[in-house]
Amino acid sequence: MNDKPNKWIFIPILAILFVMIGYQYVCPAGGQACHFRTGDKLVRIAPLATPDPTTDDLYREQDPEEDNPPKCASKFNFTERDLTRDVDFNIKGDDVIVFLHIQKTGGTTFGRHLVRNIRLEQPCDCKAGQKKCTCHRPGKQESWLFSRFSTGWSCGLHADWTELTNCVPVIMDKRQPPKRKRNFYYITMLRDPVSRYLSEWKHVQRGATWKTSLHMCDGRSPTQDELPTCYNGDDWSGVTLHDFMDCPSNLANNRQVRMLADLSLVGCYNLSTMNESERNPILLASAKSNLKNMAFYGLTEFQRKTQYLFERTFHLRFISAFTQINSTRAANVELRDDMRSRIEQLNMLDMQLYEFAKDLFLQRYQFVRQRERQEERLKRREERRWIRERRVNQSKEPIVENQTRVTTTEDYASQVVRW
């Protein structure tokens, strides 16, 4: 019997053993010499987070999307001016941040961040049991923040853009000495229209009405004929989603567009001034323009990015990081496709506004992140150049020979202090 084939089998086995031994030598266990790729990312063990990380670290450690956000083609032609938001906010001067709080957009949480979570020279004074905080400028008895949790509903419950822009300057002049010029920086929060609509339905179902809202426009509130109520009695408790959607005068429909648009452009709440086909494009265009020109707006679905952009816009830092909470009442609603389609149809203007807002928001975020990375690269480049120049200058310095040390001939004992 021929044994040569059996001998040839040992050759590849020995080769494999040789490769394995060599690999263990070149790439020992736990070594950093070799990396393996999964897809396009290196597989590695992330370093342990520090006990008290800065907010910048939190962006990188807890949200991997932050460092490399997906770049998608935009359907909107935003200019660099649209993307640039760098407010020279002077908290010690006459500048005022005005928070436009749209229902069920996470505004309550964001409003609390403004009064409790900003690192300030003179923090807001929030006393237990009180709904409002005192947010004064350093060394002055003047407020720098106009919001629910600082000045209260001074312009009416959930006042909209039309109300605030006409009311805030008057209120501020009444409460504080009139100024020749105050800078009012308007901010707001937006939310996915379907989620926001469902959240409002759930809130109304539990008894909320907001019936004390003024809805002031062109100097007056709407009449009962212009804005009829959707229910009889004190509230709409227990309302079904079908009934909620069936009310044609339900202000939940396209609420975000209505609260951000200049309603005086369409005759306020008087629907007889123009038909719907004329009214809707004007409202949407006005809401987009006002939103784009605001100092800042955030999105409920992007809490960390909202925090990041606010900090970079106003040059104010939050003490603790924002938290993304996706387990909401709206998220727990089981919604059929036909029901979702109807909600989207009822909120068609809000759907278009949110698409616009989300695109602009993410582009602003990418723009600021890219600008920061460029500044960091330039800073590192300048540091390296400074180090190189320093080394060159040191190499050109003349070498001084060590001089012979002069030894003293005095007796050591004479140098000892006698106590």
UniProtKB/Swiss-Prot annotation:
Residues the entry annotates as binding substrate: 131-132, 148, 153, 158, 203, 210
GO cellular component, one term: membrane
Residues on Cytoplasmic side: 1-7
Binding site residues for 3'-phosphoadenylyl sulfate: 101-109, 191, 199, 323-325, 329-330
InterPro entries according to UniProt: Heparan_SO4-6-sulfoTrfase, P-loop_NTPase, Sulfotransferase
Catalysed reaction equations from the record: alpha-D-glucosaminyl-[heparan sulfate](n) + 3'-phosphoadenylyl sulfate = 6-sulfo-alpha-D-glucosaminyl-[heparan sulfate](n) + adenosine 3',5'-bisphosphate + H(+)
Disulfide bonds: none
An annotated Gene Ontology molecular function: oligosaccharide binding
Outcome following mutation: residue 210 to A: Significantly impairs catalytic activity
Effect of residue 148 to A: Moderately impairs catalytic activity
Topology with respect to the bilayer: Single-pass type II membrane protein
Subcellular location(s) of the protein: Membrane
Effect of substituting residue 153 to A: Moderately impairs catalytic activity
Keyword Nuclease part of the UniProt annotation: no
Residues with glycosylation annotation: 77, 270, 275, 326, 393, 402
Protein task: 6-O-sulfation enzyme which catalyzes the transfer of sulfate from 3'-phosphoadenosine 5'-phosphosulfate (PAPS) to position 6 of the N-sulfoglucosamine residue (GlcNS) of heparan sulfate.
Family: Belongs to the sulfotransferase 6 family.
Protein name, UniProt field: Heparan-sulfate 6-O-sulfotransferase 3-B
